[in-house]
């Protein structure tokens, strides 16, 4: 329900004014995303595609990602639930200037600011990249391990994922992450699907079973 309302708002609010003079064909979204950040990323992708602005918006989001990476305090600011309307508008203006004043992105930031969703920006950036990659025939997969994997293991994992129905006719883009907290095993994420065979996950399931009343 909220997802549908969010997309309607994207089309009815500031973006609608910028697109009112164009009768663009319906945009085909390359992959379905879930979660609130996925909903907003899809709305931004659709708006940018209608404006023939995908490459520009992609570049602007890359700059925005750099802002968050280089200035960790920005994430803390946008996550502050006590920001006033004026504060949020200031944040939107500063972020807009940082990425070069991209009109589509500025309107989008205004919408999510009005909806108190500025904290979702990092997730939206990631999901937007997933959409762009999918439109190019790229299928992203992230493999998380407790320690760095050797080349032979990486090649085996890559071959297994590339040959799966998740990738199909697309081209696999493999991202590797290391997280010692999973203790061992792997967590494989392909698009919106997650396969968790980590030791930490198994321990959590065991603890759950042991805590259940007999």
UniProtKB/Swiss-Prot annotation:
Gene Ontology MF terms: proton-transporting ATP synthase activity, rotational mechanism
Cellular component, GO annotation: mitochondrial inner membrane; proton-transporting ATP synthase complex
InterPro entries reported for this sequence: ATP_synth_OSCP/delta_N_sf, ATPase_OSCP/dsu
Domain of life: Eukaryota
Subcellular locations according to the entry: Mitochondrion inner membrane
Membrane topology annotation: Peripheral membrane protein
Main location: mitochondrion
A GO biological-process term: proton motive force-driven mitochondrial ATP synthesis
This protein's UniProt keywords: ATP synthesis, CF(0), Hydrogen ion transport, Ion transport, Membrane, Mitochondrion, Mitochondrion inner membrane, Transit peptide, Transport
Transit peptide, start-end: 1-24
NCBIfam families on file: ATP_synt_delta
Family annotation (PANTHER family): ATP SYNTHASE DELTA CHAIN
Oligomeric form and interacting partners: F-type ATP synthases have 2 components, the catalytic core F(1) and the membrane-embedded component F(0), linked together by a central stalk and a peripheral stalk. The central stalk, also called rotor shaft, is often seen as part of F(1). The peripheral stalk is seen as part of F(0). F(0) contains the membrane channel next to the rotor. F-type ATP synthases form dimers but each monomer functions independently in ATP generation.
Function: Mitochondrial membrane ATP synthase (F(1)F(0) ATP synthase or Complex V) produces ATP from ADP in the presence of a proton gradient across the membrane which is generated by electron transport complexes of the respiratory chain. F-type ATP synthases consist of two structural domains, F(1) - containing the extramembraneous catalytic core, and F(0) - containing the membrane proton channel, linked together by a central stalk and a peripheral stalk.
The family this protein is said to belong to: Belongs to the ATPase delta chain family.
Protein name: ATP synthase subunit 5, mitochondrial
Species for this entry: Yarrowia lipolytica (strain CLIB 122 / E 150) (Yeast)
Lineage, uppermost ranks: Eukaryota, Fungi, Dikarya, Ascomycota, Saccharomycotina
The gene coding this protein: ATP5
